[in-house]
Each structure stands twice: as structure tokens, then as C-alpha cells.
Design a protein with these regions (language model features):
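Divalent metal-coordination and catalytic microenvironments
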Residues: 14, 28, 37, 47, ...
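Active-site HxH/HxHxD metal-binding segment of metal-dependent hydrolases
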Residues: 44, 52-150, 243
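Metallo-beta-lactamase
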Residues: 40-42, 156-163, 167-239, 243-249
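C-terminal regulatory/interaction regions
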Residues: 251-308
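Conserved beta-strand hairpin/beta-sheet module of binuclear metal-dependent hydrolase folds
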Residues: 4-54, 171-184
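Short Gly/Pro-enriched turn/cap motifs at secondary-structure boundaries
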Residues: 6, 16-17, 133, 138-140, ...
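Residue-level marker for buried hydrophobic side chains located in beta-strands
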Residues: 34, 65, 89, 179-181, ...
Length: 308
């Protein structure tokens, strides 16, 4: 089966979207360069080809900055490190600990292969990425709140802790051009339908606090880790994200309060998510729907969270 061609997208003069729309990575250019997001195993070859087509020397790329450690955001990392050993992995302190876990690596490999199989079936890649003898995710630069990744020519990214989607989540803001690498901190947004699937997998309260925090940063565009770059209406985007979260949470509480079967609610929500995206299997969506139902149930009574 032939593979689909994936071209890079110029967002600004020094910021490019790589990978695929479903699994983007971003390339920031100063005197040095940095990749933001670790992609998937399946997007590794795509990212390498796009960088080559842009005429960027790999030696210029200093860092791969990870927003968080979910499998669909780190999959290209071991392949890139094997190809370009000089790259330094930059991630938050919580992520640095999680990436040392053998259990995490086992779960990553299973999920990454599933994503690759889905992409083959969609014609986005022609073959599975190569199996590696060792999958190494060791973090070279541990990032804390307020740290700056300086690339030169005025391009510098400031680190912000934005947990809630995951405990290890960070976002990065570049003030010269006003670009905010949001990651998954605001959930899964489908621009074609203007619909949000809230993603408070770790904590509803932390998730809402992170959206509120991001809304205060000096940016005009937001680079999401799936599907889109939001440009020119970032304030409205954050408002939509928080309102969608409130609506989802209150729906869960209302339905549970009426005595509906939690399994039935989760199944219905998984079908809804599956109608929005096919980036994961239905089983994964069902598991996440059950997780979010539990999060809403455990964090009832926190309705004052939903303001910006």
C-alpha cells in the first residue's frame, strides 16, 4: 500500500507544523532549533523527511521538548535519538520520573504499535516503524516552572506546569511571535466540528486551573497536540474549552444522580468520541470515558472551577 504524502506547514517564519494533522510535532527555529512533541513511532520517518525538505541541518536541532508522557506524544523519540544522538530530551520533572518506568515502556510499545496499525489502515504510512532493541526515553534536561529554552535570535520558550490531563503535563510559551505550545492541556479539539472532548484524565480541578493559567499568557496562537493550531481567537478558544469541560462534567453528575448505569454512560460517551476521531481503538476510548466518569464523580461540588 502506498503512503500518503505529508507536507510541513509554515505557521510563522520560525515555527512549523510537522508530522500529521492527528499527531503533529512542531519545529521552532532560532539560531538553534527545537522539536516540540515526541510524535509516534509511525510519524518518525515523516518528521525526518519533512525536516530534510525544509533544508534544516539535524545538527541545528538542540532539543525535543515533551509536553507529557502519553504514548502518542513520545513515540518518535527513541527513533530520533538513535538517528541523531546529539538531541537532548527536555521534559518536566514528573515526566522524567515516569519515563524511567519499565511498565510505562511496555505500555508505550503496545499502544504505539496499535497507532501504527491504525495509520497503515488509513493509508497514512506504508509499513510499521522498525522495532528497536532498546527504547530509551531518558530525559537530558529536566524542566521546572519558569525555565527558558533559549534558541537564539530572540526565540525562547518559557515552561509552565499545566497538569490535569496528566500529572506530568507542561506547556511552553514563546513571546516574540506569541506562540503557545498547549499540548493536550485543553483537551481534544476537532476544528471541523468545533467540538471539544474534555480530557481531565488525571484531575478535573488541576485541568481547569491549567486552562485558566494558559489563558493569562502572552500568546496569540496555540499549537495543539492534535488536529490544529488555533490562531487569532485564542481567548475565545480557552472560553470554549472551559465551558465544554463544565458541560461534560455536569452531564456526568446529572446522569449519575438519576441512577443511570455508569457502564452505559461510559459506553455512550466512547461511541461519541469514536464518532469524532479514530486515532485510538474503541477500547481505549471506552477506558478513558470510564476514567473521566470516575474523575467527575470524585470531584463533585467543585462547580466554581469553570470561570476564566
Amino acid at each position: 500500500m502506498s503512503k500518503k504524502r505529508h507536507e510541513s506547514i509554515s505557521i510563522t517564519r520560525s515555527f512549523y507544523q510537522l508530522g500529521t494533522p492527528s499527531f503533529p510535532a512542531y519545529l521552532s527555529l532560532g539560531d538553534n532549533a527545537m522539536l516540540i512533541e515526541g510524535g509516534t513511532g509511525a510519524t518518525f520517518a515523516i518528521i525526518v523527511e519533512q525536516i530534510k525538505e525544509l533544508g534544516i541541518e539535524p545538527e541545528r536541532i538542540k532539543y525535543i521538548a515533551l509536553t507529557h508522557t502519553h504514548p502518542d506524544h513520545i513515540g518518535a523519540v527513541p527513533h530520533l535519538k538513535r538517528l541523531w544522538p546529539h538531541l537532548k530530551i527536555a521534559a518536566g520533572s514528573v515526566a522524567a520520573k515516569l519515563l524511567k518506568s519499565q511498565r510505562m515502556i511496555k505500555e508505550f510499545r503496545e499502544t504505539d504499535r496499535t497507532i501504527s496499525e491504525i495509520m497503515i489502515n488509513k493509508g497514512e504510512i506504508a509499513e510499521l516503524p522498525p522495532e528497536l532493541e532498546n527504547y530509551i526515553f531518558e530525559v537530558d534536561k529536566v524542566l521546572e516552572e519558569g525555565d527558558r529554552l533559549e534558541l537564539g535570535s530572540g526565540i525562547a520558550w518559557t515552561v509552565y506546569h499545566t497538569p490535569g490531563h496528566s500529572p506530568c503535563h507542561i506547556s511552553l510559551c514563546e513571546e516574540k511571535e506569541g506562540t503557545l505550545a498547549i499540548g493536550d492541556a485543553t483537551g481534544f479539539y476537532v476544528p471541523e466540528k468545533d467540538v471539544f472532548w474534555p480530557n481531565y484524565f488525571d484531575s478535573l480541578e488541576a485541568y481547569c486551573n491549567s486552562i485558566r493559567k494558559l489563558s493569562t499568557l502572552p500568546a496569540q496562537r496555540g499549537a495543539l497536540s492534535h488536529n490544529a493550531v488555533v490562531d487569532g481567537w485564542l481567548e475565545g478558544y480557552f472560553q470554549k474549552a472551559i465551558k465544554a469541560t463544565e458541560s461534560y462534567h455536569l452531564e456526568m453528575l446529572e446522569r449519575l444522580g438519576k441512577g443511570e448505569d455508569p457502564e452505559k454512560i461510559a459506553l455512550e460517551k466512547a461511541k461519541w468520541v469514536n464518532s469524532l476521531t479514530d486515532i485510538q481503538t474503541f477500547e481505549v476510548m471506552y477506558s478513558l470515558a470510564k476514567l473521566m466518569l470516575a474523575r467527575s464523580q470524585s470531584e463533585a461540588g467543585k462547580e466554581k472551577l469553570f470561570t476564566i
